[in-house]
Swiss-Prot record:
GO CC term (a single one): membrane
Keywords in alphabetical order: ATP-binding, Membrane, Nucleotide-binding, Transmembrane, Transmembrane helix, Transport
Annotated positions binding ATP: G151, A152, S153, G154, S155, G156, K157, S158
Gene name linked to the record: ABCG2
Name under which the protein is recorded: ABC transporter G family member 2
Disulfide bonds: none
Coiled coil, from the record: none
InterPro entries reported in the protein's UniProt record: AAA+_ATPase, ABC2_TM, ABC_transporter-like_ATP-bd, ABC_transporter-like_CS, ABCG_dom, ABCG_transporters, P-loop_NTPase, Pigment_permease/Abcg
Length: 755
């Protein structure tokens, strides 16, 4: 170790490097606390190791590589192994201790409706049951240790992890949770902790290295150089054992990528990029084979030994995994049936008169016994009571063997010492100021940086899936070709005018229906977004604005393709000016449609239900657009739906663009009788009828007299109150309106907290 660090002590190297990566904590005004001398330290922290690795990389020469001489980077790597395996007790002179006492959480469950029970119900009966998920859970987790919460399905494992991770509303959870004796503020906990969900929520077409780098750009501050961020990512890849998979895409059902165990380690790396003090994990080994599960827990052990508190729920750990765990909590229906070291399990169950047989997995035996008791008459109540007595009996011995508990520093002192040691990854440094205290920012980066990173990640992920845009473009082109061939070169007859109305109605509704693909796209990102915003990786407003901006280029391509395919083939009027208005109306329709569907995808979390709702609502929009029934004939109680129809405004805009020329005629003389029984008579008869009508009307009506202009058609459709440009701007405004609603949906619906 001394050979790697040279003559400088670890603390001196850290304090002397103003570029040392630490998390976004600003040291300000607190009295410096006395720390043990550097000579008492037998381990380097992760940040120190990171600095050494980077220095070694900078010093490595081409000649040493050519001659096969061991390079400084190899020495740094060996230092990493020593650091990773260092005993937890040597890591920190100011340890962190997370304590929780009497945690109780219950939910109200509505009884199923029973008509017979309703008839018999007395006045005191209630239709609501209360289910206790946590019942007086207490415990303590220390820096450098791993605590595992075990139990059968429904025992309360995930609920306890959520409670400790501040994912349950405070007014619903009773009890206390403290770090070094102080209640954690929500804003501080988001900065110094991380939560790894059970599902691996990753962008499929990003590589492992890119995934972690984007996480670094989100969680590490702008003040930290790109070089330092890359160094942190490279060191984390080595720590997670992902070097061989660094350039491999994550993958999904349609794209081959990393293995399940590697995917899980990437998920963990995503959330620990900022080197958190506390790490919560919900069943990190779920769905993995025994080898992959062991590797994941081994990685978590390294993270704990770097100076973190690791708390996880785990279903049924193997014998090898048990050897890595420091503290266990067994739960049964929300009650603690055992808490303590794995080494005390045999003694505990032996005193409970259920000794663990020799050569049997201790956790499997405990879980099987708990399961048997749950189905017995008394349930697990005897075991719960015995555990309370056993803990009370063990308390004096436990306290004597753990006198270090009394030496826990205050939270402020511990965090300040952690910054001094380089534990937290931030742009702040420990200078020689006489007063230092950590000050936490809500977000690591400014708004515009977040927007750039979100957009860059989304574009990179989409660029590697060209089939998504290709399918949308193909659908739009096929629809455009079908319409162009069905409505080729429409004439200016009454039938031609009617066919134009049909073309516009179908064209406008098509633009909205093709936007339905946004539902699975956002739902794929929904839980990634929830995970990242839960710990303030970026602002929700940054996500909404960035996603809105990067969606526009695709909409421009789709709009141009559809407009170019149909406008001249159908024979629409207006020349170049008419074409550009038609194009911008199509673009505005795509914008409004994608915004509307994006908003609904934020409200409805199910793909199939989302498609059903979107298709139904768009059908209603088309029904009330004015094509099937004019505004004047819509019942007054449905008129409001006409005005909120997204199809109404682009439909009326393109109709005005087509029929605004007052000199353009769509019915002359004898064409007046088309679409009526008189239309079957010879032209001579029709001419005589026109002469007779002229005498009655007092106006000469000949076979060439224009009887219906474009303006007349607009009046027949009831399109007289809004200009075509206003229709365009209203359509654009609808798009912005639904984006704002989408933002509030994310703001309200992504709190990641149980009620």
């Amino acid at each position: 170790m001394s050979g790697l660090l040279g003559k400088s002590s670890p603390a001196k190297r850290v304090d002397g490097n103003n570029d040392l990566p630490m998390y976004y904590v600003n040291p300000m005004s607190v009295e410096p606390q006395g720390r043990p001398s550097d000579t008492t330290r037998v381990s380097v922290t992760f940040a120190e190791h990171l600095m050494n690795v980077e220095d070694a990389r900078n010093d490595e020469s081409a000649s040493s590589r050519a001659l096969g001489i061991a390079s400084p980077i190899n020495s740094a790597a060996s230092s990493f192994n020593s650091w990773a395996s260092a005993p937890a007790s040597s890591i920190s002179s100011s340890p962190f201790v997370l304590s929780f006492t009497d945690l109780t959480y219950s939910v109200k469950i509505q009884k199923k409706f029973n008509p017979l029970a309703c008839c018999r119900r007395s006045g005191n009966d209630s239709s609501v049951n209360t289910k206790i998920l946590l019942n007086g859970i207490s415990g303590e987790a220390r820096e450098g240790e791993m605590m595992a919460v075990l139990g059968a399905s429904g025992s309360g494992k995930s609920t306890l992890i959520d409670a400790l991770a501040n994912r349950i509303a405070k007014d619903s959870l009773r009890g206390s949770i403290t770090l070094n004796g102080e209640v954690l503020e929500s804003s501080m906990q988001k900065v110094i902790s991380a939560y790894v969900m059970q599902d691996d929520l990753l962008f499929p077409m990003l590589t492992v290295e890119e995934t972690l780098m984007f996480s670094a750009e989100f969680r590490l501050p702008r003040s930290l150089s790109k070089k330092k961020k890359k160094a942190r990512v490279q060191a984390l890849i080595d720590q997670l054992g992902l070097r061989s998979a660094a350039k491999t895409v994550i993958g999904d059902e349609g794209h081959r990528g990393v293995s399940g165990g590697e995917r899980r380690r990437v998920s963990i790396g995503n959330d620990i990029i900022h080197d958190p003090i506390i790490l919560f994990l919900d069943e990190p080994t779920s769905g993995l084979d025994s080898t992959s599960a062991y590797m994941v827990i081994k990685v978590l052990q390294r993270i704990a030994q770097s100076g973190s508190i690791v708390i996880m729920s785990i279903h049924q750990p193997s014998y090898r995994i048990m050897g890595l765990l420091d503290q266990l909590i067994f739960l049964s229906k929300g009650n603690t049936v055992y808490s303590g070291s794995p080494t005390h399990l045999p003694q505990f169950f032996s005193e409970f008169k259920h000794p663990i047989p020799e050569n049997e997995n201790k956790t499997e035996f405990a879980l099987d016994l708990i399961r048997e008791l749950e189905y017995s008459t008394e349930g697990t109540k005897p075991l719960v009571e015995f555990h309370k007595q056993w803990r009370a009996k063990q308390a004096p011995s436990y306290n004597n063997n753990n006198k270090r508990n009394t030496n826990v520093s205050s939270l402020k002192e511990a965090i300040t010492a952690s910054i001094s040691r380089g534990k937290l990854v931030s742009g702040a440094t420990n200078n020689n100021s006489s007063n230092l205290t950590p000050s936490f920012q809500t977000f690591a980066n400014p708004f515009w940086i977040e927007m750039i990173v979100i957009g860059k990640r989304a574009i990179l992920n989409s660029r590697r899936q060209p089939e998504l845009l290709g399918m949308r473009l193909g659908a739009v082109m096929v629809t455009g070709i079908i319409l162009a061939t069905m409505f080729t070169n429409l004439d200016n007859s009454p039938k031609g005018a009617q066919e134009r109305l049909g073309f516009f109605a179908f064209a406008m509704s098509t633009t909205f229906y093709t936007c339905a693909e946004a539902i699975p796209v956002f739902l794929q990102e929904r839980y990634i977004f929830m995970r990242e915003t839960a710990y303030n990786a970026y602002r929700r407003s940054s996500y909404v604005l960035s996603q809105s901006i990067i969606s526009i280029p695709a909409l421009i391509v789709l709009s141009a393709s559809f407009a170019a395919t149909t406008f001249w083939a159908v024979g629409l009027d207006g020349g170049a000016n008419g074409f550009f208005f038609f194009y911008f109306t199509i673009l505005a329709s795509f914008w409004a449609g994608s915004s509307f569907v994006t908003f609904l995808s934020g409200v409805i979390p199910n793909v199939m239900l989302g498609f059903t709702v979107v298709v139904a609502i768009l059908a209603y929009f088309l029904l009330f657009s004015g094509f099937f029934i004019s505004r004047d004939r819509i019942p007054v109680y449905w008129l409001w739906f006409h005005y909120i129809s997204l199809v109404k405004y682009p439909y009326e805009g393109v109709l005005q663009n087509e029929f605004q020329n007052p000199t353009r005629c769509f019915a002359r003389g004898v064409q007046l009788f088309d679409n009526s029984p008189l239309g079957e008579f010879p032209n001579d008869v029709k001419v005589n009828l026109l002469k007779s009508m002229s005498g009655v009307l007092g106006t000469n009506v000949t076979a060439e007299t224009c009887v219906t202009t474009g303006i007349d058609i607009l009046k027949q459709q009831g399109i007289t109150d809004i200009s075509k440009w206003n229709c365009l701007w209203i359509t654009v405004a609808w798009g912005f309106f639904f984006r704002v609603l989408f933002y509030f949906t994310l703001l309200i619906g992504s709190k990641n907290k149980r009620k």
